[in-house]
Amino acid sequence: MRINPTTSGPRVSTLGKKFQGRIAQIIGPVLXVAFSTGKMPNIYNSLVVXGRDTAGQEINVTCEVQQLLGNNRVRAVAMSATDGLTRGMEVIDTGAPLSVPVGGATLGRIFNVLGEPVDNLGPVDTRTTSPIHRSAPAFTQLDTKLSIFETGIKVVDLLAPYRRGGKIGLFGGAGVGKTVLIMELINNIAKAHGGVSVFGGVGERTREGNDLYMEMKESGVINEENIAESKVALVYGQMNEPPGARMRVGLTALTMAEYFRDVNEQDVLLFIDNIFRFVQAGSEVSALLGRMPSAVGYQPTLSTEMGSLQERITSTKEGSITSIQAVYVPADDLTDPAPATTFAHLDATTVLSRGLAAKGIYPAVDPLDSTSTMLQPRIVGEEHYETAQRVKQTLQRYKELQDIIAILGLDELSEEDRLTVARARKIERFLSQPFFVAEVFTGSPGKYVGLAETIRGFQLILSGELDSFPEQAFYLVGNIDEATAKAMNLEVESKLKK
């Protein structure tokens, strides 16, 4: 692993005077810096402005070179606020791209875009660092085998399975269980795959980032007593950050994930919330740099920027990075260039439904709207495919009958339709599941359900063998044996009441 100079702390002052330039112009978060002839920095090099403002406060602003303007000038985008900077201030070229700490030292900690800890838990070991700008793995390194990434969550594994090293779009509004689903996936990958997770908060609310951190500590995903046993590293670039930080924070998180994949040879889960904010920040930077806008005001390099991030998220022969990306769709317009460009990269979509959340069915994953390219007989096998299709058909028929039931009632349906409705309601409830990370709130122990068990359970419901069981027996259980046991208990309880 190449060790690069870090862009913060006392080490910067040791860089030779030959790397120095001066601020020539400041336009918001964009700086034009003049260097002497022959000392020009490269594109993506990290520059540091160190000095004092007019009030005597110390300034340490890191920038990234974006354009070489000619006349020995470069244009750079600041990664933090440019308050207090003045023309003529000294700028130091670090001679390398922005580098961030990687490895086990990052687990359980919160970082900003520069790889600096922001959780008040002391310094982080920076002996091993990695540059945030890297090329995607070569074709010869890629693992092209199509394999399912088992999550232990029934509705996901059966109806919209994730691909190992794939990219999943997570669509969900506020309060439908997105955070809990994210935390459960982080927990399950750590237990079942011995993997770790990296969470990149791109342009999200500071409050949401804080809530996620607190909930992770409460559920044990972050171990406060022994921080090294934590299962996740967090990287935040919130809404209040300059566009440069929001544009690069996704790369910082990805760089940390790549180290776990390439060096530790682990399966890594990378969460990006929200991928739209990455595009939005890129659009702001593009406008500040004076580029001609493209369709709907987006940057002309939209596809290139998205591609350079997404192509690094992949499986290699060493390990895999499976990415789950929250996708905001502006004005619910799926043809908007930002979501449209994102969809081109996704292998699966997990849609969270407010209707299911209102019924108390968690995880509130919509079984009919969620899709996956992996749900093909040649990949998942005939048995899995047939079971998934029959489950979807049953739920679709139930959806079609709901209007009739609402107007005329259940008694007006044919015998066959009544049976379909009864089975669909059992399936709907069996798609719910108690989560490990929700134990502290619900009091019921979490369940990890293997794919074979999931398929067996739904086959039994579809075959009609469990038609005599009450539908509440299928609610918030793990495998089908638990539902059977619950049905027996309910029967005993009802007899005792009589």
UniProtKB/Swiss-Prot annotation:
Catalytic reaction list: ATP + H2O + 4 H(+)(in) = ADP + phosphate + 5 H(+)(out)
The protein's Enzyme Commission number: 7.1.2.2
Entry GO MF terms: ATP binding; ATP hydrolysis activity; proton-transporting ATP synthase activity, rotational mechanism
UniProt cross-references to SMART domains, sorted A to Z: AAA
One cellular component term from this protein's GO annotations in UniProt: mitochondrion
Main location: plastid
Main EC class the enzyme belongs to: translocase
Domain of life: Eukaryota
Compartment(s) where it occurs, according to its Swiss-Prot or TrEMBL record: Plastid, Chloroplast thylakoid membrane
Membrane topology, record value: Peripheral membrane protein
Keywords: ATP synthesis, ATP-binding, CF(1), Chloroplast, Hydrogen ion transport, Ion transport, Membrane, Nucleotide-binding, Plastid, Thylakoid, Translocase, Transport
Alphabetical GO biological process terms: proton motive force-driven mitochondrial ATP synthesis
Positions with a binding annotation for ATP: G172, G173, A174, G175, V176, G177, K178, T179
SUPFAM superfamilies: C-terminal domain of alpha and beta subunits of F1 ATP synthase (SSF47917), N-terminal domain of alpha and beta subunits of F1 ATP synthase (SSF50615), P-loop containing nucleoside triphosphate hydrolases (SSF52540)
Family: Belongs to the ATPase alpha/beta chains family.
Subunit description: F-type ATPases have 2 components, CF(1) - the catalytic core - and CF(0) - the membrane proton channel. CF(1) has five subunits: alpha(3), beta(3), gamma(1), delta(1), epsilon(1). CF(0) has four main subunits: a(1), b(1), b'(1) and c(9-12).
Role of this protein: Produces ATP from ADP in the presence of a proton gradient across the membrane. The catalytic sites are hosted primarily by the beta subunits.
Protein's name in the database: ATP synthase subunit beta, chloroplastic
Organism of origin: Nymphaea odorata
